[in-house]
């Protein structure tokens, strides 16, 4: 009963306005008030500051600086085997497994389609049909930078406007097509494991999504789909990443979805819905290796 009330209220909340206000406050240098907010947040959500490169609260002038805090060097070792992929973020596995034709599991009893997730891009959806997916939820206490599961060449980025529903387990289990209706940034990479997509999904109070190569993607929230394409490998302006390298960040946190083409990787057997993740640990193993190709347009 209480959960139903929470969901109904969430539909009614002015989520855009709340998110704008939260983003404004999170960037304010409000002195003692900022410190009070940071300490209260850390206490309520049991944030482990011992892992932070700057463990003292006083090191953070704004709430956003605290929220996107970096970790101590080498505290998240990245799997080094070239045939293995690394987890992209700290968090909890929401769902993972096979994309059954074009259906992804959101929560028990709830599915959504690849094409809806990819903003109606049928050509792109076909590449990942019958592939694998992993959805990772970043809770408020987690480290909120997102890293690369493997070496990759950036081919395309798509910004998709949308709702700003919370993406916690309660909403995932009760809001249909949650990840396909929320604001998101879709990043397509070419890798030695074939095409890979990494999606950063927005949510209520996520003030912004930033990428390593271009800075802030949202806001502004203009309500239109935007698309960027990037140069080929070896040409001026090409953007590539190494496994474990930071590629984006949330202010405040949300969800990361990874998509892999069929017959390329096998997800690690120890991972299941509810598994705790640490960036850099084992995500998957290669089924076959191939040289990066140029078959994505």
Curated annotation (Swiss-Prot):
Class of the enzyme per the UniProt entry, highest EC level: lyase
Reactions listed under catalytic activity: a 1,2-diacyl-sn-glycero-3-phospho-L-serine + H(+) = a 1,2-diacyl-sn-glycero-3-phosphoethanolamine + CO2
GO biological process: phosphatidylethanolamine biosynthetic process
Membrane topology: Peripheral membrane protein
CC terms in the record's Gene Ontology section: plasma membrane
Entry's localization field: Cell membrane
Protein EC: 4.1.1.65
Family membership noted in the UniProt record: Belongs to the phosphatidylserine decarboxylase family. PSD-B subfamily. Prokaryotic type I sub-subfamily.
Protein known as: Phosphatidylserine decarboxylase proenzyme
Organism: Photorhabdus laumondii subsp. laumondii (strain DSM 15139 / CIP 105565 / TT01) (Photorhabdus luminescens subsp. laumondii)
Gene: psd
């Amino acid at each position: 009963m209480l959960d139903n009330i929470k969901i109904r209220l969430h539909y009614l909340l002015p989520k855009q306005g709340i998110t704008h206000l939260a983003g404004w406050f999170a960037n304010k240098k409000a002195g003692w008030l900022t410190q009070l907010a940071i300490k209260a947040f850390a206490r309520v959500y049991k944030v482990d500051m011992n892992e932070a490169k700057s463990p003292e609260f006083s090191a953070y002038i704004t709430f956003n600086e605290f929220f996107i805090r970096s970790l101590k060097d080498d505290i998240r070792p990245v799997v080094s085997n070239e045939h293995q992929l690394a987890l992209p973020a700290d968090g909890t596995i929401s769902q993972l497994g096979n994309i059954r034709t074009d259906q992804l599991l959101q929560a028990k009893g709830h599915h959504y389609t690849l094409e809806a997730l990819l903003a109606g891009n049928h050509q792109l959806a076909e590449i990942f049909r019958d592939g694998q997916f992993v959805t990772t939820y970043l809770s408020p206490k987690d480290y909120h930078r997102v890293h690369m599961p493997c070496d990759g060449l950036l081919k395309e980025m798509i910004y998709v406007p949308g709702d700003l529903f919370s993406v916690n387990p309660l909403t995932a289990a009760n809001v249909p097509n949650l990840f396909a209706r929320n604001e998101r940034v879709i990043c397509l990479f070419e890798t030695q494991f074939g095409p890979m997509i990494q999606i950063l999904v927005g949510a209520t109070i996520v003030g912004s999504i930033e990428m390593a190569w271009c800075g802030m993607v949202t806001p502004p929230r203009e309500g239109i789909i935007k698309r960027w394409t990037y140069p080929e490998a070896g040409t001026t302006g090409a953007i590539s990443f190494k496994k474990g390298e930071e590629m984006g960040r949330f202010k405040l946190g949300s969800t990361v979805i990874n998509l892999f083409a069929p017959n390329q990787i096998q997800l690690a057997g120890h991972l299941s819905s509810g598994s705790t993740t640490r960036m850099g640990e084992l995500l998957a193993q290669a089924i076959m290796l191939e040289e990066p190709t140029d078959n994505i347009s």
